[in-house]
């Protein structure tokens, strides 16, 4: 069954970071994000080979052109519901999607730098999945 809640699922088990959001961004709760060269949050690009800093945004936020002072809360590690672009199976290792920015998919291939966590045993499927982000770099 798909989770109806996006973002952090258990705040006591999560590690959060508060990050400035880049200008001209619309980030929705449950999207996979990363930071740009300036350290501002953006939607994670497809098949993001440099997935050294990935987060799941825990709130909806929209920034205007030139606006870089708004801060949002992101899940760095722990259980959260995130948008998926394809079916995710229980226990599967997950990575940034190679088809849809801001979403995840089951890990495939040999580039282990893409792995960001694994699917939790419940609430898997539908348009979002419960995952455990356990990669910290």
PLM region descriptions:
Residues 1-137:
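Glycine-anchored, exposed beta-strand/edge motif detector
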């Amino acid at each position: 069954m798909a989770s109806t809640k996006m973002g952090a699922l258990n705040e006591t088990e999560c590690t959060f970071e508060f990050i400035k959001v880049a200008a001209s961004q619309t980030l929705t709760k449950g999207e996979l994000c990363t930071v740009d060269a300036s350290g501002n949050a953006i939607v994670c690009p497809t098949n993001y080979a440099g997935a050294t800093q990935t987060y799941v945004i825990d709130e909806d936020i929209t920034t205007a052109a030139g606006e870089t002072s708004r801060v949002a809360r992101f899940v760095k590690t722990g259980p959260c519901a995130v948008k998926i672009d394809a079916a995710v199976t229980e226990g599967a290792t997950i990575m940034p999607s190679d088809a849809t920015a801001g979403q995840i998919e089951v890990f495939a291939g040999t580039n282990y730098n893409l792995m960001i966590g694994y699917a939790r045993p419940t609430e898997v499927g539908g348009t979002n999945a419960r995952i455990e982000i356990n990669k910290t770099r």
